[in-house]
Amino acid sequence: MAQKPLSTAAAERMNLVGQDEIWKYRLKAESEARQNWPQNWGFLTTPFEELIKCEEDLPTPKPKIELPERFRIRPVTPVEKYIKVFPSPPVPQTTQGFIGWRSAVPGLNKCLELDDAIRSCKGAFARELCWPKQGVH
């Protein structure tokens, strides 16, 4: 009788030479990592007290260097020197008590009452051009 063909996974399990090479490669990588660990990660084994010992020593203050006058920062100019804030005018009397409505003082509404007649603009431009009425509507 004929045997069933081996699957890929079964064939890989039977490849002992390939498995041995993979095992050697893994062992070599592990030994290299073990040798390189102190160089890359050795600072993690340093005791905490030794690490903070350097921080406890206060650094010596740097000598202050006098800058020439042209490099010094000028003092801040107060805002009141270049911005003048005058008191607000009194709130005008209005019919509704709000700013923006028509004033209750009769003389202040003149500019609002100039165009009290409502005019229709429909056809005004056409009349200036002397168009016939059929073209307006």
Curated annotation (Swiss-Prot):
What Pfam families does the database record attribute to this sequence? LLC1 (PF14945)
Tissue expression pattern: Expressed in airway epithelial cells, renal tubular cells, pancreatic acinar cells and epithelial cells of the stomach, duodenum, and gallbladder (at protein level).
Keywords for the protein's UniProt record, in alphabetical order: Cell projection
Where located?
Cell projection, Cilium
GO CC annotations?
cilium
Q: Which PANTHER family match?
A: CHROMOSOME 20 ORF85 FAMILY MEMBER, SIMILAR TO PROTEIN C20ORF85 HOMOLOG
Return the protein name: Ciliary microtubule inner protein 1
Q: Which organism is it from?
A: Homo sapiens
Q: Which gene encodes it?
A: CIMIP1
